[in-house]
Amino acid sequence: MTADVKERVWNKIDSQKAEIIKLASDLIRIPSENPPGNMSEIAAFVVGYLEQHGLVCEIYEPENGRINIICSLGEKTGKELVLNGHMDVVPAGDSERWDFPPFIPVIMLIAAPV
């Protein structure tokens, strides 16, 4: 990756910072612990977000609550890019052991040691 491409990517991220923070916060608020593995609520949110941004989504639910989302953008010609991720998180466990509630987003500024 050239320095120019890196700079353009970082500039794009900087220009979208508020939306990225809102998206991450919205995702954190949706419990998606596995087990039990019910992804219905978070999948509905993800599909809604992606469709708002022009993607066409298909939902596959091989088991109740176990959801896969396949989306496409634009015409199906030329090069393709596949992104693979997951929507579930490990169980939060004992909430008393958390510094902050696990499903309430907190933004902290952490300074590097001097």
Where are the predicted features?
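Acidic/His- and Gly-rich active-site-bordering loop/insert found
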Residues: 2-113
